[in-house]
């Protein structure tokens, strides 16, 4: 299980997160809902241990691996897809594209454009490539910041199908999103407002929170 308890973070006088607590178990997916500036990205940064909170406690297995995929694709446009992979996972092409990593690329349909420059790829291709690179580190907890933003329906469905399979096999996922389609794979929903968790919903306990309109109202409330 991954958890944070009573976490707070400020930048100067700007309070970004205040007394935030949540936990995610193997095989669970949590959605973080909230308008821009509500603290979602900062919370993901803290969970990935890239941002140090001002206060609060962590509850992580010391051997557990958390990986963050930020909203902006961390790719070098002038390089090919395979060379971008090798930046994050050094080695020869043969070493990097072992059976494990090739399986990830095939599952995300990345194997068909490994030799193309990133500058020539569509937004959906870039997102799938970034996700593949992230998954090659074998994360126990996958942190996703707006993974479906600006993608077409086919690409969204492909990514969601991949994530559902990852969750089914015991992976944990936390998604910061505005996309109601992402909520189909989520067990729990947290809404953030002004750095506070405003509402926490367990869909197994509160099945009434199912319609897209409900989630849109939660984000705007």
Predicted segments, located by residue:
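Helix-to-loop junction immediately C-terminal to a conserved catalytic motif
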Residues: 48
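Catalytic Walker B motif of ABC-type/P-loop ATPase nucleotide-binding domains
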Residues: 142-146
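Conserved structural motif at the start of ABC-family nucleotide-binding domains
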Residues: 2, 17-19
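The feature captures the beta-strand-to-loop junction immediately N-terminal to the Walker
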Residues: 33-35
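Helix N-cap at the start of a conserved alpha-helix in ABC-type nucleotide-binding domains
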Residues: 153-155
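Conserved ABC ATPase signature
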Residues: 117-124
């Amino acid at each position: 299980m991954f958890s944070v308890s009573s976490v707070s973070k400020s930048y100067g006088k700007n309070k970004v997160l205040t007394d935030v607590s949540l936990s995610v178990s193997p095989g669970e997916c949590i959605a973080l809902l909230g308008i821009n500036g509500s603290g979602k990205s900062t919370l993901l940064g803290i969970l990935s241990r890239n941002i140090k909170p001002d206060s609060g406690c962590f509850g992580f297995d010391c051997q557990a691996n958390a990986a963050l995929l930020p909203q902006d694709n961390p790719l070098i446009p002038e390089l090919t897809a395979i060379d971008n992979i090798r930046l994050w996972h050094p080695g020869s092409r043969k070493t990097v594209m072992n059976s494990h990593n090739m399986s990830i690329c095939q599952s995300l349909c990345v194997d068909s454009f490994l030799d193309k420059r990133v500058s020539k790829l569509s937004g959906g291709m870039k997102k799938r490539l970034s996700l593949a690179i992230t998954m090659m580190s074998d994360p126990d907890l996958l942190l996703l910041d707006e993974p479906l933003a600006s993608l077409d329906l086919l690409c969204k469905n492909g990514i969601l199908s991949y994530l559902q399979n990852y969750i089914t096999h015991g992976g944990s996922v936390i998604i910061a999103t505005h996309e109601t389609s992402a909520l189909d794979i989520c067990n729990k929903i947290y809404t953030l407002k002004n750095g506070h968790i405003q509402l926490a919903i367990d869909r197994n306990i509160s099945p009434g929170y199912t319609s897209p309109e409900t989630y849109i109202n939660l984000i705007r409330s």
